[in-house]
Regions:
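Interaction-mediating elements
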Residues: 1-124
Length: 124
């Protein structure tokens, strides 16, 4: 679809390893940019529905990294996932501590813990 291709090139001019998938009347682009893996869905008219990108601590904006590390200083950031949908820009940060795994969501300078579970005790 020409509208989709045009929108994609405008939004992600430096995309690499691009693959397209068609779902009903929508298109999913999988690609890499700035060492983050993206899944981006477009409507037929070229409007982007969402962009989800998967990365690591170094991909987080400095402000968000500082906010997370200030509260969870004894946790190591293992994944950083950026979800852009309509006007929203959400970062999902996965972390690992000595005894627990945590997931926090950061949106508009607000941070919420969305998942927390203890590591399994392993017996030798």
């Amino acid at each position: 679809a020409p509208n989709v291709n045009k929108s994609f090139k405008k939004a992600f001019p430096d995309a690499e390893d691009l693959s397209w998938y068609k779902y009903d009347k929508e298109y999913l682009a999988k690609f890499i940019t700035k060492d983050m893996n993206h899944n981006t869905r477009f409507r037929q008219n070229g409007v982007m529905k969402y962009d989800i990108s998967y990365g690591y601590e170094h991909n987080l904006p400095e402000k968000i990294k500082e906010m997370v590390n200030k509260v969870y200083d004894n946790y190591k950031i293992t994944r950083a996932i950026n979800v852009k949908v309509t006007e929203r820009n959400i970062w999902v940060v996965k972390m690992e501590g000595m005894k627990k795994y945590l997931t926090v969501r950061v949106e508009d300078d607000e941070m919420d813990e969305v998942e927390s579970f203890y590591k399994a005790e392993t017996q030798n």
